[in-house]
């Protein structure tokens, strides 16, 4: 079992993958359980991207490749843009409809 060395902390690849899988499962559960609140859906998607980033970093460190870190930076940039756009849309919806409950926003009105 190979260990990742980070500033005198040794974490095995298995522990890192278990942590990443746990993050991914929590985010999927957040999406499945709470389909009504837009903010919780956005946070669950961000948590899912964090799990993917963790996987990229674990495997990049395991194979001593720098490309995993490069992919993480690109994913973080896309996630930041997605969060900014998503929150702007949520604010616009809240100002117009006075709610962010998805069950009340299912009508397409002009």
Swiss-Prot record:
- Name the major location: membrane
Annotated GO MF terms: NADH:ubiquinone reductase (non-electrogenic) activity; quinone binding
The protein's name is: NADH-quinone oxidoreductase subunit K
Keyword tags? Cell inner membrane, Cell membrane, Membrane, NAD, Quinone, Translocase, Transmembrane, Transmembrane helix, Transport, Ubiquinone
Reactions the enzyme catalyzes: a quinone + NADH + 5 H(+)(in) = a quinol + NAD(+) + 4 H(+)(out)
Give EC number(s), comma-separated: 7.1.1.-
Keyword Transmembrane part of the UniProt annotation:
yes
User: What functional role does this protein have?
Assistant: NDH-1 shuttles electrons from NADH, via FMN and iron-sulfur (Fe-S) centers, to quinones in the respiratory chain. The immediate electron acceptor for the enzyme in this species is believed to be ubiquinone. Couples the redox reaction to proton translocation (for every two electrons transferred, four hydrogen ions are translocated across the cytoplasmic membrane), and thus conserves the redox energy in a proton gradient.
What Pfam families does its record include? Oxidored_q2 (PF00420)
Q: How would you classify this enzyme at the top EC level?
A: translocase
Show the HAMAP family listed in the entry.
Answer: NDH1_NuoK
Q: Which GO terms describe its biological process?
A: ATP synthesis coupled electron transport
Species, as recorded: Francisella tularensis subsp. tularensis (strain SCHU S4 / Schu 4)
Top-level division of the source organism's lineage: Bacteria
- Give the GO cellular component terms, alphabetically: NADH dehydrogenase complex; plasma membrane
**Entry's transmembrane regions:** 13-33, 38-58, 70-90
Q: Which PANTHER family match?
A: NADH-UBIQUINONE OXIDOREDUCTASE CHAIN 4L, NADH-UBIQUINONE OXIDOREDUCTASE SUBUNIT ND4L
